[in-house]
Amino acid sequence: MLPNAIQLISQAIKDKRCIAIRYHDQRQIRVVEPHAIYTDERGELVMDCYQTRGYSASGRPPPFWRPFRMKKITAVSVLKETFQPRITEGFSANRLKYRSGLVAIVQDSQPVFGYVYPSHTTEVGPHLPGKA
């Protein structure tokens, strides 16, 4: 594994920046949106990514989800291109595999919506009608 790969990719995850990687000594480049780095059940560091373009050993054309073993990444370049978490494509920060050994995970920047239930309100302040 590259000496500074974890730091570079963790920062890319935090900043929601795409990265270009070389994997397993292959010459071809893959462009991915890194969503999480975690330790799997075998104790290996894994990066979950949404690959948007570049080489695919399976021949399947991107885009698709793909895990990458950190120890097999031979080159990393952080790109200027940004991304939003792929919630509609299946990403969830609540997956069981992320609960232990999590190194970095993308934060969803979508607004949180809620409901106000009248039975759960509390009156505060003298500014309310009928208050002195």
Model-derived features with residue positions:
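Core beta-strand-centered patch of the WYL/Sm-like small regulatory domain
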Residues: 1-132
